[in-house]
Regions:
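Active-site regions of enzymes building and remodeling cell-envelope glycoconjugates
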Residues: 153-158
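Alpha-helix capping/helix-boundary segments
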Residues: 36, 71, 112, 130, ...
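Active-site neighborhoods of divalent-metal-dependent phosphate/nucleic-acid chemistry enzymes
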Residues: 19, 24, 85-87, 99-144
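Phosphate/NTP-binding elements of NTP-utilizing enzymes
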Residues: 75
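ABC-type ATPase nucleotide-binding domain
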Residues: 78
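Short, structured coil segments at secondary-structure junctions
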Residues: 101, 151-152
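Short, well-structured N-terminal submotif of metal-dependent ribonuclease cores
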Residues: 1-67, 81-96, 137, 147, ...
């Protein structure tokens, strides 16, 4: 028996927020780290099956992936120093990404900055802010970053 879709769970919510699996609703939403998003944007080579499945579900609008603003800023810096080639401006990259409503920008808040400052998986400020976003949303983080996985404060998917 396939999963039946629920309507929006709250005012303004999308029908992508949850699916029914048996008697319990299971959220189909994730937070992305920078590296897996860039792998997906460049064709998906190097993603694990589970991570690729999350992005595939998002592309099919069967899941939501939240993109922390720290991911966009890190992407900008990586492009600026030549470590990644977006093939276009960051603005065009973001416009293309967010043209699919299943990709949702997640704004940085003062609370996330405080959380990142108080508890971080390593010395990388982007990892700290991205993990703070996942903690704030209480959603799993798509990442293969070993220190984040070992940290254990954030559920990870890889």
């Amino acid at each position: 028996m396939g999963a039946a879709r629920l309507g929006p769970a709250r005012p303004g919510a999308s029908d992508l927020d949850q699916v029914v699996v048996g008697p319990v609703a299971e959220p189909k939403a994730y937070v992305t780290d920078t590296h897996p998003l860039l792998l997906h944007a460049s064709g998906g080579r190097g993603l694990s099956r589970r991570a690729a499945g999350c992005y595939k579900a998002c592309e099919e609008r069967a899941a939501i992936i939240y993109v922390p603003m720290a991911v966009l800023w890190e992407t900008s810096l990586l492009a600026r120093v030549g470590r990644v080639d977006l093939g276009r401006s960051l603005r065009a990259f973001a416009e293309d990404l967010f043209s699919n409503p299943a990709y949702q920008p997640f704004d940085l808040t003062a609370e996330q900055v405080s959380l990142a400052d108080e508890s971080r998986p390593n010395d990388d400020p982007f990892d700290a802010l991205i993990c703070a976003s996942a903690l704030d949303l209480q959603l799993p983080l798509i990442t293969r970053d070993g220190p984040i996985q070992e940290w254990g404060r954030v559920r990870t998917i890889w």
